[in-house]
Amino acid sequence: MRILEKAPAKINLSLDVHGKRPDGYHEVEMVMTTIDLADRLELTELDKDEIRVSSHNRFVPDDQRNLAYQAAKLLKTRFGIQKGVSIVITKTIPVAAGLAGGSSDAAAALRGLNRLWKLNLTLDELAELGAEIGSDVSFCVHGGTALATGRGEKLKHIATPPHCWVILAKPVIGVSTAEVYRQYDASKVEHPNVERMIEAIEAKDYKEMCGSLGNVLESVTLKMYPEVDMIKRQMKRFGADAVLMSGSGPTVFGLIQYESKVQRIYNGLRGFCDQVYAVRMIGEQNALD
C-alpha cells in the first residue's frame, strides 16, 4: 500500500518570545499560518521491519536525525507496530530556512502512517505525539492558522487570514537557532502585539495585518547576518506591502495584496537571491490534501 501526504511550509505572522522555562525551552506566543509551498511524502509499507528515509536533496538526513524518521519510530514504539516503512521525501521547502520544513515532514509522516497502519488516531492525538518530536510539529499536523503558546505545542485555531500573495527569499546562509536564542534578551526588544494581529485576521483587515507583523528574533538575526537585512530592504524597495523574517531566519517573506505586483518583486529579488518563491497564503485547516 502507498500513501501520499502533502507537507506545507508555515510562516510566523507574529512571534514573541518570553522567559526560559525550567525544561530549557522558551515560552513563546506565535501566530502561524500555512502557505502553498510544500514538500511531498510517499509512504510505502515494507515487508522488512525497518524505517527507510530517502530524498533527492542531499541536505536531508536519512537516519534518526530526520524528523519524519523520528515520527515513524515514535509510532512504531508507542503502538507496537512490527511493520516497516519507506518514506520518500520530495523537498520543495528550503532546508534550515525558518519555514518548519522538517517539522511539516514529521507531521505529514504522522498523518500518513496513521492511515497506512490504520491507527485511527485523531489529529489532536497526532498533534500530542508531534509535540514529543518538535515544537512546531503539533501546528504542522493541523495546518491552517493558529495562535501557538507554551513552547509552541498549545494551539488555538483562528480564522483564515485575508487572501494575499507571499514572496519568500532565502539567502545562502545557515542560521543557528540555538545561537539566536542564546543572544536574545527579552528586555531589549520591542514585542509585537499578538492580540492586534489576531484581531486583524479575524476582521479580514489586510492593512492592519500588515501593520501588526512582528518577530522579536529578527533584531538578533539581523545583527548576526547582515544578508537578511539586505533582503528585507530590497523586498521593501521592490514594493512588498509588508516584510518580516520567518522564525529564527534566514528566510524573509513579503506580503503582496495584488497579483499584478508579484512578478516584478519576484524578478527583482532573483538578482540578489537564488531561492525566491511566489506562493499564496493558505491558512485553512482543510488545505492539507
Swiss-Prot record:
Cited Pfam families: GHMP_kinases_C, GHMP_kinases_N
Active site: 10, 136
Catalytic reactions of this protein: 4-CDP-2-C-methyl-D-erythritol + ATP = 4-CDP-2-C-methyl-D-erythritol 2-phosphate + ADP + H(+)
Superkingdom classification of source: Bacteria
GO function term, MF aspect, one: 4-(cytidine 5'-diphospho)-2-C-methyl-D-erythritol kinase activity
Enzyme class: transferase
Biological or metabolic pathway of the protein: Isoprenoid biosynthesis; isopentenyl diphosphate biosynthesis via DXP pathway; isopentenyl diphosphate from 1-deoxy-D-xylulose 5-phosphate: step 3/6
GO BP annotations, alphabetical order: isopentenyl diphosphate biosynthetic process, methylerythritol 4-phosphate pathway; terpenoid biosynthetic process
Functional note: Catalyzes the phosphorylation of the position 2 hydroxy group of 4-diphosphocytidyl-2C-methyl-D-erythritol.
PANTHER family: 4-DIPHOSPHOCYTIDYL-2-C-METHYL-D-ERYTHRITOL KINASE, CHLOROPLASTIC
Protein family (similarity comment): Belongs to the GHMP kinase family. IspE subfamily.
NCBIfam families: ispE (TIGR00154), PRK14608.1 (NF011202)
Name recorded for this polypeptide: 4-diphosphocytidyl-2-C-methyl-D-erythritol kinase
Native species: Bacillus pumilus (strain SAFR-032)
Gene: ispE
